């Protein structure tokens, strides 16, 4: 977690407490593979029929477990190597604790949802469509439909010469812009970078400037 900026630079402002919850069985339920596990949290994949979407239905039961320590946010590390997780703003997050090479990336991606509600910047491969009406400005800091883009901090961070929308240029993969495609759809929703930890976890390991600034502002707000 603290290997990734801007969490790394703010490590001293976090308190992390682990609650160990013993279970009758080990692992996570995977309905699509007919794998069923009797565990304390009852975590399972295939939420909304998405293989990688791991969640916990009994939130009150999860809160009972977490209540053994003081907390502001709940994050569950599930005992599995299977890629996946989930995170909901001001609710809780969960991800695989033992994925061979992306455990940390999944953790910080989902925590981006949990801590301040960053939006998913990737396209497709979900069970829901039209989550962002194109005539409504998303409240998430890192997504826009350009309906009311001027009110976002993102707009103020742009170079005045940057075209909006911004064409993807492979020679400048980390140029801040307004790139079409995000919020699960190809058209009508825009993201700040061609790629970011809120987008494709396979090819990058940093947050874009918009996400980083939003995270820092939320940490500052919570630590006043």
Task: Annotate each PLM feature.
Residues 1-8, 114, 118, 218-222:
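Structured segments of extracytoplasmic/periplasmic soluble domains
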Residues 10-16, 69-74, 194:
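Loop/turn elements at helix/coil->beta-strand transitions in domains of secreted/extracellular proteins
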């Amino acid at each position: 977690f603290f290997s990734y900026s801007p969490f790394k630079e703010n490590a001293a402002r976090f308190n992390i407490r682990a609650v160990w919850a013993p279970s009758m069985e080990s692992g996570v339920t995977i309905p699509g593979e007919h794998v069923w596990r009797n565990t304390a949290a009852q975590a399972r994949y295939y939420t909304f029929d998405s293989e990688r979407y791991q969640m916990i239905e009994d939130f009150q039961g999860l809160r009972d477990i977490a209540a053994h320590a003081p907390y502001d946010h709940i994050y569950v590390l599930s005992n599995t190597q299977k890629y996946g997780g989930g995170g909901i703003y001001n609710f809780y997050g969960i991800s695989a604790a033992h994925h061979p090479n992306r455990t940390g990336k999944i953790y910080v991606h989902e925590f981006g949802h949990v801590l301040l509600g960053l939006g998913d910047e990737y396209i497709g491969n979900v069970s829901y469509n039209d989550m962002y009406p194109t005539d409504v400005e998303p409240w998430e800091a890192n997504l826009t439909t350009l309906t009311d883009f001027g009110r976002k901090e993102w707009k103020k961070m742009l170079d005045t010469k940057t075209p909006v929308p911004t064409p993807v240029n492979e020679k400048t993969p980390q140029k801040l812009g307004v790139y079409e495609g995000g919020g699960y759809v190809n058209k009508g929703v825009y993201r700040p970078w061609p790629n970011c930890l809120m987008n494709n976890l396979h090819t990058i390991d940093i947050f874009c400037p918009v996400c980083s600034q939003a995270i820092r502002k939320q940490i500052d707000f919570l630590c006043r």
